[in-house]
Amino acid sequence: MEGTPNVPQAHRYELTLAGRPLVLETGKYAKQASGSVLVRYADTVVLATAQASETPVEADFLPLTVEFEERHYAVGKIPGSFMRREGRPGEKAILSARMTDRPIRPLFPKGFRHEVQIIVTVLSADQKNPPDILGPIAASAALMLSDIPWEGPIAAVRVGLIGGSFVLNPTLQELEESQLDLVVAGSKEAILMVEAEAGEVDEETLVQALEFAHKEMQPILELQEAMARELAKPKMAWTPPESLPEEEKEALYRLALERGLSQVLQTASKGERSRALAEFAERLIAEALPKGEDGTPDEGKKPLYESAFDEVVRRELRRLVLEEGKRADGRGPKDLRPIWIEVDVLPRAHGSAVFTRGETQVLGTVTLGTGRDEQILDDLGIDETEKFLVHYNFPPFSTGEVRRLRGVSRREVGHGNLAKRALKAVMPKEEDFPYTIRVVGDVLESNGSSSMATVCAGCLALMDAGVPIRAPVAGVAMGLVWEENRAVILTDILGLEDALGDMDFKVAGTRKGVTALQMDNKVGGLPREVLKEALLQAREARLKILDLMEAVLPAPRPELKPFAPRILSLKVPVEKIGLVIGPGGKNVRALEELGVEVDIEEDGTVRIYSSDLQAALEAKKRIEDLTREAKVGEIYEGTVTRITPFGAFISLFPGTEGLLHISQIAPGRVARVEDHLKVGDVIKVKVHRIDERGKIDLIRPELEGKIPPRRRR
């Protein structure tokens, strides 16, 4: 690295992680940001900046945005768009932004309402070490150095499982052979976020992997703490939003219990509960509001009471779970909601299913496509295609709301990716089922756990389509209520329980093991036993769901649906690929006139796609005829194409002809070939010899032994 003499000296903090240098650097770049850190891991480099607005905004939530920006120069490329510049973030960038957002969000102080923006920019990608795990580390370090109040640090690591051993931060090449792709983010005391894709890994191995990850991230946390001790700015002064004094909150809680809050909360239907709760809140707040001397309520305090009422509801829901083992819809902690399933629900879809669990309902569909339907991946520097696609749609009517449809949200991208990871482990190999497969999960109703319902609906739709998956997959969302060393694990959580719990995690898998895991922890460190128990309780629920799914459709259908395309595959010699294509693509165009699509790969693999099986078979026959090679001793029905004084040329199949010498046409002396054969005659001939130049000598099989074969000079 070269520069002028006055280049500022950066502050560097370094350690070795999985045999590669991890460097945190600050003080040289992006110095006007409140916090900025350059993180380098091997030759992958990201820059993270943290900035907060000077004044708070009117909101009842933390206005945090996290952006993950990929620059094509990071891999030495120019963007392929018309404008030749980066556009909207791709799916991988969105998932990386979510991976950074989720572990840092819970660590902002309650009530902090200043806008916070974290931008992680990938400056260099060595295409060996994925940049996504550097996002949480860099964002954490930038926040630690900034004046933004935040209770970090956090760190993130990736864990693989190769040959029965855990591998820390596996490279992209190592991930291809790994049975596990586990990303864990956490603080010193706790695991805060988990994202995992697994090849049917058992629960005990997962717990061990989580412990391994948490142990290995500790040096990264210590490095950030050392940096912050020396360089961190004083934290900005901020004023928490006004709230009711604790004694008034307590009085409101007692009054709510007296007026029957517990009974209102235990209304089975989501809609009825919401309406009853809104009416109850209105009556309760009207009664609880302080009154003036003339009896007029103090309306100025109403927003404070409305906010306090939300805390009252959360407190009572948690009490019901912890002390009475009761949930909002009347279930016990381990109970699943009622489930009903339908398959083959759409007449033209290649596969379809509806999976309904309580008030959550997903329509799953499968479409089978050709090689031309593969998705071109938008990953930074990766020129690959994807044959398995899973898309998740969450329309507003699914929750009884009205809002604009503004394209795919980050949440939809994240949930679709989770469902994809859950199903990917059981998908057939390309050579066994060479289709492009698109699964779509349309959420028709939602009251919690819609991503896991998408896994179930998607799996059933795959089986309905006749996709030979290795095993059925089901998923379930779990929750945890934790207080004073008491833990209650909740199976199949409602949307309401998702908000009140201390940890939510989604587990998908087969009877054999877990294929996908997503976890967000909102409390401190959880004992190993609690994590293990939660995973085992999820397994118990998963097996019950699989029983119900298999009762409807025990295995993939043996045949594809009538409207699904058929694929025929064959292999042609590489040197004959040009013959199949023809001059200027003439032969391929002629094949496509049959109503088929033809894909030809560099190794000579030819795939023929058509919804008309007969058309596909005809196309296959034509290709076989084009690429056939004559074999000595084989008999063919050939057509006379030319007559010469020394014999007749016979076409055995398109592109291949041989010579039937005049001496082999008939017994005795033949004066003129035309006396025995004419152009267009169809006769049986046998390949007698093929010389080193590929020239073919033919004989008539019925005269074999009666006429001595011709000898070449």
UniProtKB/Swiss-Prot annotation:
<keyword id="KW-0963">Cytoplasm</keyword>
<dbReference type="InterPro" id="IPR012340">
    <property type="entry name" value="NA-bd_OB-fold"/>
</dbReference>
<keyword id="KW-0694">RNA-binding</keyword>
<dbReference type="InterPro" id="IPR004088">
    <property type="entry name" value="KH_dom_type_1"/>
</dbReference>
<keyword id="KW-0479">Metal-binding</keyword>
<comment type="similarity">
    <text>Belongs to the polyribonucleotide nucleotidyltransferase family.</text>
</comment>
<dbReference type="InterPro" id="IPR012162">
    <property type="entry name" value="PNPase"/>
</dbReference>
<dbReference type="GO" id="GO:0000287">
    <property type="term" value="F:magnesium ion binding"/>
</dbReference>
<comment type="function">
    <text>Involved in mRNA degradation. Catalyzes the phosphorolysis of single-stranded polyribonucleotides processively in the 3'- to 5'-direction.</text>
</comment>
<feature type="domain" description="S1 motif">
    <location>
        <begin position="633"/>
        <end position="701"/>
    </location>
</feature>
<dbReference type="InterPro" id="IPR015847">
    <property type="entry name" value="ExoRNase_PH_dom2"/>
</dbReference>
<feature type="domain" description="KH">
    <location>
        <begin position="565"/>
        <end position="631"/>
    </location>
</feature>
<dbReference type="GO" id="GO:0004654">
    <property type="term" value="F:polyribonucleotide nucleotidyltransferase activity"/>
</dbReference>
<protein>
    <recommendedName>
        <fullName>Polyribonucleotide nucleotidyltransferase</fullName>
        <ecNumber>2.7.7.8</ecNumber>
    </recommendedName>
</protein>
<dbReference type="Pfam" id="PF03726">
    <property type="entry name" value="PNPase"/>
</dbReference>
<keyword id="KW-0548">Nucleotidyltransferase</keyword>
<keyword id="KW-0808">Transferase</keyword>
<dbReference type="GO" id="GO:0003723">
    <property type="term" value="F:RNA binding"/>
</dbReference>
<feature type="binding site">
    <location>
        <position position="498"/>
    </location>
    <ligand>
        <name>Mg(2+)</name>
    </ligand>
</feature>
<dbReference type="InterPro" id="IPR036612">
    <property type="entry name" value="KH_dom_type_1_sf"/>
</dbReference>
<keyword id="KW-0460">Magnesium</keyword>
<dbReference type="InterPro" id="IPR036345">
    <property type="entry name" value="ExoRNase_PH_dom2_sf"/>
</dbReference>
<dbReference type="Pfam" id="PF00575">
    <property type="entry name" value="S1"/>
</dbReference>
<dbReference type="InterPro" id="IPR027408">
    <property type="entry name" value="PNPase/RNase_PH_dom_sf"/>
</dbReference>
<dbReference type="InterPro" id="IPR020568">
    <property type="entry name" value="Ribosomal_Su5_D2-typ_SF"/>
</dbReference>
<dbReference type="InterPro" id="IPR015848">
    <property type="entry name" value="PNPase_PH_RNA-bd_bac/org-type"/>
</dbReference>
<dbReference type="GO" id="GO:0000175">
    <property type="term" value="F:3'-5'-RNA exonuclease activity"/>
</dbReference>
<dbReference type="InterPro" id="IPR003029">
    <property type="entry name" value="S1_domain"/>
</dbReference>
<dbReference type="GO" id="GO:0006396">
    <property type="term" value="P:RNA processing"/>
</dbReference>
<dbReference type="InterPro" id="IPR001247">
    <property type="entry name" value="ExoRNase_PH_dom1"/>
</dbReference>
<dbReference type="Pfam" id="PF00013">
    <property type="entry name" value="KH_1"/>
</dbReference>
<dbReference type="GO" id="GO:0005829">
    <property type="term" value="C:cytosol"/>
</dbReference>
<dbReference type="Pfam" id="PF03725">
    <property type="entry name" value="RNase_PH_C"/>
</dbReference>
<dbReference type="Pfam" id="PF01138">
    <property type="entry name" value="RNase_PH"/>
</dbReference>
<feature type="binding site">
    <location>
        <position position="504"/>
    </location>
    <ligand>
        <name>Mg(2+)</name>
    </ligand>
</feature>
<dbReference type="InterPro" id="IPR004087">
    <property type="entry name" value="KH_dom"/>
</dbReference>
<dbReference type="GO" id="GO:0006402">
    <property type="term" value="P:mRNA catabolic process"/>
</dbReference>
